[in-house]
A protein has these predicted regions:
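C-terminal soluble interaction/assembly domains
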Residues: 304-309, 394, 746-749, 756, ...
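Flexible, small/polar- and glycine-enriched "cap/hinge" segments at structural transition points
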Residues: 719-722, 729, 734, 770, ...
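Bacterial N-terminal signal peptides
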Residues: 1-5
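Periplasmic polypeptide-binding modules associated with outer-membrane biogenesis and secretion
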Residues: 14-373, 385, 408-416, 421, ...
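A generic beta-sheet turn/junction motif
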Residues: 129-131, 144, 244, 622-624, ...
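Sec/Tat signal peptide C-region and signal peptidase I cleavage site
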Residues: 9-13
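Gram-negative/organellar outer-membrane beta-barrel architecture
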Residues: 166-167, 172-180, 191, 291-292, ...
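C-terminal outer-membrane beta-barrel translocator/porin domains of Gram-negative envelope proteins
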Residues: 272, 281-288, 370-381, 393, ...
């Protein structure tokens, strides 16, 4: 019988001396590192365990070691300029025999931890045609694996049944079932012995004990004995010594504020306590140099009941609630085990909890500048927008962690020929770190990690000189509930989302814009009188929109870097049911007019609709993390109901642009294979298809794939990434939308084009591809993309590379495309 004691992290390989930098210069350069003989473990995993590496190659082309060349060029230049090149390059990968020996030992230890006790590792250095170039070849003979046969827990007999069940039934091993003769022993099938997996199991048992009241348990409380009943299998016995079971005792909040008046107050913190064990813990607070903080914030944040059994999970939930308010810069929650008390000699122990926090400055004022592609007011061309904003924030306006923010912004946009638009906007918002009545019960029903309520108002006015349009005012109001189910899964419920828009026209509106959108009226363009009227209404009539929306989001990716993880989002909304009900029951009983009264005698149009969409994004790191494969798939459908047969303009879908299908400009793609009329032509479509889809669509499908590779490190304090991408997608009219009329031909009668048809949709997908550059600072990413059309579904551009490599699309933006 072989007995091993597992009480620490996996064993480390014994290190041997390596060469100094000066002595490395006399060694040959490593051309390639090979690993062979590994059948059970992937090569990528083994490469992560060794330090002997060759220089990176561009696109894996032999000899194309761009980063080494950059480094050597810096050596040649010297000085500060040379230092900059060396910092962005990669030093030559010289052979280090001591490092190779250490890698052999690392691989041997790694294989032993993976259950291959008899694995043999060797390394050969093979000279190439050039004497200064070598290949390092690691040869692996894995030998037979060792399997884990059983896992027995000792010391669980005195634990509460719920804690026992959690430990036994939630093992990290997939094929583990309790044996008949011993309920605390698991029979494990088809599981290779892995030391890291056993350590993970030990950590899981620790969590179960700490969440079951055993606050003093540590890693030393669990020891694993490994037995070898057969040469190819192990039995593991975990001895658990949980110690004493604790309850939450007295709770002391200590709050430090940013003021310097040295004031101290001790308000009452009123929370329920559990006195069933013969002791009623107290909850107290000491607040220094902070005049605004209310004890109600502390009461809501407390996620455990004093007097109940100790749970580390509930303690961490309290910390998350405190930090989620945004009122604190620092939080620290500590169980005071040394001060634990037992009110009765034979009674249970109570552990006091010390909660220390530090509040942030309440008032903050910040200015910002920003660049954007205008999408607010019915664009017809890609525009570069520049703006300035000013934001005031009060981090604790009502004393209970409520955050007030007032943002104002002004922006202008240009198409490089002239100033095309001016926009002013303001948005006050109030974020509450709790759910308002009557939604507070959702927190208890779903056992949420964190909750917020956001109330916001918005106002916007804008002028579009190129379209001869202006928006006198667009007013909005929103009540949103934010529910965090886990750290990565959240729900957003827009209980109220109201907008009132009052557009107006300027001189020459008809000539510059309307005639092109509606067509010449000769049987082409938009011929349906209902849709013609609705298009005019989009740009000339006041409108009212309301929506009830639910969004479910799972996000594990960093929102800025997006190097790994995912963002999965699904949303469904029903719109304008409120004005529909008011129209039917209050304003025109028994009939529908699709209008409701507005201000000053105006009538407001509304269009009921349903809308659902799915947005899936996945980020896969490649190699050693220098590259990322980004994938995105999007699908959305909007469907009108009631009298109107189109959805509101701002709830339609558009395709094309820097974050969509990049071979086209902003909103230039679709609907379907149709092409809108070009300005000034009246009868002919644009020759290059560069006319925005003003109508939008009811159905949208898109897919994107992008490879991002870091090519330069820390040049101008930023990482430089080269990207290659392929995008595809389009938008279509839905079944109720009248669509665009096409003239009759000898082969087919006139019909509405732009409609979604399953048989023709694949041929109507636009495809674009290109290269891009990302300049990534720590908190800021600049994006440049150059894209070409691979397949244009419009009638005049139905060939692949019809224009060769002429007329590419250049997109500039902030942040990654997706």
């Amino acid at each position: 019988m072989l007995c091993n004691l597992l009480i620490a992290e996996p064993a480390q390989a014994q290190q041997r001396p390596v060469l100094t930098t000066e002595s490395l210069d006399d060694q040959p350069v490593i051309r390639e590192v090979r690993i062979t003989g590994n059948d059970a473990i992937r090569t990528t995993r083994l490469r992560q365990r060794i330090q002997t590496q060759a220089n990176r190659r561009v696109l894996s082309i032999p000899g194309f070691t761009w980063w080494r060349w950059v480094y050597q060029f810096g050596d040649t230049v010297g000085g500060r300029v040379g230092d900059a090149f060396r910092a962005s390059g990669e030093a030559p990968a010289y052979l280090d025999p001591g490092l190779v020996d250490n890698d052999v030992e690392r691989l041997r230890v790694f294989y032993e931890q993976q259950g291959f006790r008899d694995a043999r590792i060797s390394a050969d250095v093979v000279e190439g045609d050039d004497s200064d170039r070598v290949t390092v070849h690691f040869r692996i003979d894995e030998g037979p694996p060792t399997y884990l046969r059983s896992l027995e827990y000792r010391g669980l007999q005195g634990l509460p049944e719920p804690v026992q069940a959690t430990i036994v039934n939630e093992s990290v091993f997939d094929d583990a079932t309790p044996t008949d003769e011993n309920p605390f022993k698991l029979a494990i099938a088809n599981q290779r012995y892995e030391t890291p997996l056993l350590l993970e199991e030990r950590q899981r048992v620790l969590r179960a004990l700490r969440n079951g009241g055993y606050a003093a348990v540590s890693r030393d409380s669990i020891r694993a004995l490994v037995f070898t009943p057969q040469p190819d299998s192990f039995d593991v016995r975990m001895r658990v010594r949980p110690g004493r079971r604790y309850r939450f005792g007295d709770v002391q909040f200590t709050v430090e504020g940013p003021l310097s008046n040295s004031s101290t107050r001790q308000p009452t913190v009123d929370v329920p306590v559990d006195s069933s064990a013969g002791y009623a813990p107290t909850v107290a607070a000491t607040i220094r140099n902070e005049e605004r903080l209310s004890p109600s914030l502390l009461e809501r944040a407390l996620q455990f009941t004093p007097g109940d059994y100790y749970s580390q999970e509930q303690l961490l939930a309290t910390k998350r609630r405190l930090e989620g308010t945004g009122a604190f810069t620092f939080t620290n929650l500590t169980p005071q085990l040394s001060d634990s008390l037992r009110p009765a000699p034979d009674g249970e122990a109570f552990v006091p909890i010390q909660i220390e926090t530090r509040t942030r400055e309440r008032h903050q004022l910040r200015a910002e500048t920003f660049a954007l592609q205008r999408e607010v007011v019915s664009d017809v061309e890609s525009e570069l927008g520049l703006g300035v904003g000013l934001t005031y924030e009060n981090a604790n306006v009502l004393g209970g962690g409520e955050r007030f923010q007032m943002r104002t912004a002004a922006s202008v946009a240009t198409n490089l020929d002239s100033l095309t638009s001016v926009q002013l906007e303001a948005e006050p918002s109030l974020t509450l770190p709790y759910l308002v009545y009557p939604f507070g019960g959702l927190d208890d029903w779903f056992d949420l990690v964190d909750t917020r309520t956001r109330l916001s108002l918005s106002g916007l006015t804008a002028r579009r000189d190129d379209l001869r349009l202006r928006i006198r005012a667009r007013l909005g109001a929103q009540l949103r509930l934010e529910l965090d189910h886990t750290e990565s899964l959240s729900s957003f419920i827009d209980v109220v989302d109201l907008t009132i828009s009052n557009p107006d026209t300027l001189d020459q509106f008809s000539e510059r814009f309307l005639d092109r959108v509606l067509g010449p009226g000769d049987g082409t363009g938009i011929t349906d009188p209902v849709q013609r009227r609705q298009i005019i209404e989009d740009y000339t009539e006041p409108q009212f929109n309301s929506a009830l929306r639910y969004t479910l989001q799972s996000a594990t990716a960093n929102p800025l870097r997006r190097r790994q993880g995912h963002v999965y989002e699904g949303a469904f909304e029903i719109g304008n049911v409120l004005p529909l009900a008011l129209d039917w029951f209050a304003f025109s009983p028994g009939s529908l007019t699709s209008t409701v009264p507005g201000f000053g005698g105006q009538t407001l149009l509304y269009r009921p609709y349903l809308r659902g969409q799915v947005d899936l994004r996945r980020y896969i790191p490649l190699g050693s993390g220098r590259s990322t494969l980004a994938l995105r798939a999007f699908g959305g459908v909007a469907h009108p109901f009631g009298i109107p047969d189109v959805v509101p303009f701002d709830r339609r879908y558009f395709s094309g642009g820097g974050t969509s299908v990049r071979g086209w400009g902003l909103r230039e793609l679709g609907p379907g294979s149709t092409t809108l009329l070009a300005p000034g032509t009246q009868t002919q479509p644009s020759a290059n298809g560069d006319v925005a889809n003003i109508l939008g669509g009811d159905i949208k499908l898109e897919a994107n794939i992008e490879l991002r590779t870091r090519i330069i490190r820390q040049l101008l304090a930023a990482n430089w990434l080269l990207t290659s991408f392929v995008d595809t997608g389009n938008v279509w009219f839905g079944p109720r939308n009248p669509g665009l009329a096409t003239a009759a031909t000898d082969d087919q009668p006139a019909r509405a084009s732009g409609r979604f048809r399953l048989a023709t949709a694949p041929q109507e997908l636009g495809v674009g591809a290109g290269l891009g550059l990302r300049i990534a600072w720590e908190f800021f990413i600049v994006r440049l993309d150059l894209a070409y059309r691979m397949h244009d579904p419009s009638p005049l551009n139905d060939d692949v590379f019809r224009n060769g490599f002429r007329d590419p699309r250049l997109h500039f933006g902030i942040g990654h495309a997706f």
